[in-house]
Amino acid sequence: DQNNWAGKYPNDWNNYTKLMKDAAAAYQLALRWKLSETDGAQYADAAVAILNDWAKTCTGFIVNDKGEFIDPNEFLIFIQVHQIANAAEIMRSYPGWQEADFVKFKAWIADVFYPHITKFLSTHNGNECALHYWLNWDLSAMTALLSIGILADDNFKINEAIQYFKFGIGSGNIGNGVP
């Protein structure tokens, strides 16, 4: 969030670029560990360090007094949410990731991202035409929602993503996305 990062990264106060790079790194490191023919603990430890750092440092988004993103392009951060959630899902079986840290990460990803994801899918940023946003906007939100649900073992969130795919109001609905 801006309070944590504005001084350190004045040109990236919303952390989008940091999350993009860190999510990709955590995912690649997790894969490298999981597919390693040797121990690969150095890859696992590096992935876990990235995941733990985000859960400890990032406290949320900068929003206006209505709880809305200042820049609507911040909805695109959902593209990285599924990637970092999938990295955590791979790492959940790593014995070196402390259970308390894993629990904290699950709570963090759900608390920080889920409210914005579900709000976007239900309101499309207040746009009168739910189809205003192209398919990729809904798909990134749906995959983020599904990934959070799977990571958190939360059937409500998993079903919310599936139900949106089947019956949602926007382009992510299969009937709207593939006419």
Give residue ranges: language-model regions:
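Aromatic-lined, polymer-binding surfaces characteristic
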Residues: 12-179
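Low-complexity, Ser/Thr/Pro/Gly-enriched N-terminal "stalk/linker" regions
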Residues: 1-12
